[in-house]
Amino acid sequence: MSSFLVSSNNLPEREIPGDYGFPIISAIKDRYDYFYKQGEDVWFHSKAEKYNSTVVKINMAPGPFTSNDYKLVAFLDANSFVYMFDNSLIDKTDTLGGTFKPGKEYYGGYRPVAFVDTSDPNHAALKNYILTSFAKRHNLFIPLFRNSVSDHLFQNLEKQVSDQGKSDFNALLPNMTFGFIFRLLCDQTNPSDTVLGAQGPEHLRKWLFPQLIPSLSARKLPSFIEDLLFHNFLIPFGLVKSDYNKLVDAFSKNAGSMLDEAEKLGIKREEAVHNILFLVGINMFAGLNAFFPHLIRFVGEAGPTLHARLAKEIRTAIKEEGGAVTLSAINKMSLVESIVYETLRLRPPVPLQYGKAKKDFMVQSHDASYMIKKGQFLVGYQPMASRDPKIFDKPDDFIPDRFMGEGVKMLKHVLWSNGRETENPAPDNKQCAGKDLVHLLGRLMLVEFFLRYDTFTVEITPLFRAPNVAIKTLTKAT
């Protein structure tokens, strides 16, 4: 039995409930409900409520006509969801994006490691390469990120709040995150000094758009137009080829040490470049730009009482380190740490995990056992798993100190990284290679905020997944 799973021999076996409905028509109706009428959260909850089960058959968006394989079984509670982490049961080959997959031309003819199952010998080599590359650069994480938020975020926040009465936090993130990532992986080269100029984030967003939009709603067009354009057909790579080629050129010329490291591990430089770009685009750029708005939203909405606690904890820890922002100081900040975990629990950057059954197996929810047949396409919806009321008290509430003190025992139920928070990424698993980096950067974001400000207020505009956060006021540190 996998260490991920908690099983019981006393649960009754049930047939998997649910109904795929009429071919194509029912799937399109489900797609409209998922994207436009209900939204992702309500849609998944409605399926569980309708069939009184957290293991249920669904038509998974986007469905027709981007994919012919959209009849899935969904795992919607903490107990069933963790089966998605068991590499002996779940095949992750080409399932990262769900029921559709972008062509290999998006990645230079290669399949990045995220699309490769652990049973493929290439997986361990590529995952080890990424892990060792991060390890060799760990001393750069704090200084490079601090420089990036200082240069690209806070100066602009303050100016916009002063001049315009508010600042669009989300709009300022791409330049900051891209600059940090590029300097981290490209020997501290400033992206504006390369062929990319100031357009690096824009090239990256254009390349990412056709890969992500089939599973999202931009909410910028009438629903029927958006659905027709983006959920029925995959966008041809040719439309973004020039953007991708500029990114390849920039990283090929400036990520010299990372490419040298790849060659020493037996990985071709060309393959390494395309894996680096996937890491940069999907794992880091898209992930951080989804995570940070939720973090600032939750903290901003919590108000001045929490802000005072954070400011005191952060400034005290920094003072004890002689005024330096060090990893040692950050590790003393238990409230900051808990808030980052709580944000990742409530709003994981990647909410859906996909895979196909490698063999017949029994999956258990809290209430029953279900037979999964070999080849069945599966999806786990993480926000329901990590807000499972049978695991967490007040599961939908943002509780800043949830993971302080005895609360650290609940970290095994924080699942955002494609693994338990108590587990670590390794060459033989699919857990996010940047797990520890994301957590560090979340803490650093709060440290930088509350070294500068005593409190702030926010205005929130809901979007399909990440909210748009406007900073309304900033009260400088006293």
From Swiss-Prot:
GO cellular component labels: cytosol
Top-rank taxon: Eukaryota
GO molecular function: colneleate synthase activity; heme binding; iron ion binding; monooxygenase activity; oxidoreductase activity, acting on paired donors, with incorporation or reduction of molecular oxygen
Binding site for heme: C432
Tissue expr: Not detected in leaves, stems or roots of healthy plants.
Entry's induction text: Up-regulated 2 hours after addition of elicitor, with a peak after 4 hours. In roots inoculated with zoospores of P.parasitica (Ppm race 0), detected 1 day-post-inoculation. Up-regulated by ethylene and methyl jasmonate. Not induced systemically. Not induced by salicylic acid or by wounding.
Role summary: Strictly inducible cytochrome P450 involved in the biosynthesis of the anti-fungal toxins colneleate and colnelenate. Can use (9S)-hydroperoxy-(10E,12Z)-octadecadienoate (9-HPOD) and (9S)-hydroperoxy-(10E,12Z,15Z)-octadecatrienoate (9-HPOT) as substrates, but has a very low activity with the corresponding 13-hydroperoxides (13-HPOD and 13-POT).
Keyword Hydrolase (UniProt): no
Reaction(s) the record says it catalyses: (9S)-hydroperoxy-(10E,12Z)-octadecadienoate = colneleate + H2O; (9S)-hydroperoxy-(10E,12Z,15Z)-octadecatrienoate = colnelenate + H2O
Native species: Nicotiana tabacum
EC number of the protein: 4.2.1.121
A matching Pfam family: p450
The protein, known as: Divinyl ether synthase CYP74D3
Family: Belongs to the cytochrome P450 family. 9-divinyl ether synthase subfamily.
Keywords: Cytoplasm, Heme, Iron, Lyase, Metal-binding
Matches recorded under InterPro entries: Cyt_P450 (IPR001128), Cyt_P450_E_grp-IV (IPR002403), Cyt_P450_sf (IPR036396)
Intracellular or extracellular location(s): Cytoplasm, Cytosol
